[in-house]
Amino acid sequence: MRNVSLSYRNQYAMSLPGFKPMIGDVFGQRSGMGAMSPGLDFAFGFIGDGYIEKARRNGWLLMNDSLATPATTNRTEELQLRATLEPVRNLKIDLTATRTVTTARSVQYMYEGNPTTQSGTFTMTTTSLRSAFEGSGNANNGYRSKSFDRFCSSLDRIRNRVEARYAVAVYPAGTALAGKPFNAENGGVSRYSADVMVPAFLSAYTEMGDGGLSIFPSLSHLLPNWTLRYSGLSKLPWVRDVFKSVNISHAYKSVYAVGSYASYSTYMEYMNGLGFINDATTGMPVPNSMFNVSTVSINEAFSPLLGIDVTLQNNMTIKAEYRTTRVMSLSMTSVQINEASSHDWVIGAAYTLNNFNPFGGNRHRRVRQRGRSTVAGASQQKTGSNSRNTSSSGVNNDLKLRLDLSLRKQASITRDIATMTSAANSGNTAFKLSFSADYTLSRMLTMSFYYDRQTNTPLLSSSSYPTTTQDFGLSMKFSLTR
């Protein structure tokens, strides 16, 4: 292990309108309203959301129903872990794990009970390898996915586990069933609620399991992403004879994210994060978490899954990569999983022809050196090491060639959870060929030629049609700065 680093950032901000005490001269403190205000904890930044209740209790706030501006707080917590490993020589592995939570609260302190709303976002690194290589299916099998089948089959099991947590619960005060024991016949945990579908989503697509039946998994479920680089092959004798360098690369990234969420206005907590909301149709209290989560997603990328970069002994460079990306979004609003994926194969080569002369052999010219006449073309190899790469005009007439080939396949699939069916929305297969040549004619003049060809074949012929585009040209670049 080469090095390990840990960083934690906690940023907190508060806006408290209607604060009556004036600011004092010593640490901003002033006495005269029962206690020293705004308090040393405020002066040194050691406050939290509980400070609003403290200010209200000490009479520091303007309690007027006409004051419509609530107190607001914003908190950002970010944890980042980094480690660099070198298990064998020339093999380096970088591990990264991050977890970021943002929370915004709005408190109507001027009303009884301090009505509070909360919103925020959540992201953390994870791994989703168990579903990465299963494929998305095709038109022949109805775009069947093993991960989606696992997800659908686990919904009832997880719903029963969530509902079991309410086994000894009683309905909260202020409802038609206040004080009575919970009965699922009056309205149980919905099969398509975020409390059920998000843990099933994590269990089917990632290695973190069901996240402890939580929409916001704890630190114990944090998993790292990684980058791998290996350059040791060029040290082998039989490889060194052909290649100057051989580099192999691999990188993996997977991030679980909860889009913007907000608390339910009718939420009534039972205990330990369990509570009830009023059903929009019946008005009866039903078990549900505090937050209305509309979308969660997993963003995965192999960039690349495998990459090889080599330099031959003649200085030709060749690069080949295979990249994949996948974005899976679970929507509680439409009760669907949208899966967008891409696969890229890229091959590129570059080579430079030094002192390339398309017009024949060396151009001879007579030059005078210290009183004697010589033929520049005949004596060029004896004038020093730099003359091998320099023409008689003192310019390297290099021809730089580059060829790139790429194949990209994209597909977007919608999976309906209620009907357990899948259908392709869009997709495309694109093949691209790019060739370029740059030739240095003189110190000030460079000639360039390029040719690009791209072919697009849509996945669904009903939405578009195949196209082919070609682009080529010749340019001359004249520079006055050389």
Roles of regions detected by a PLM:
Residues 1-482:
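Exposed, low-structure sequence patches enriched in small/polar residues
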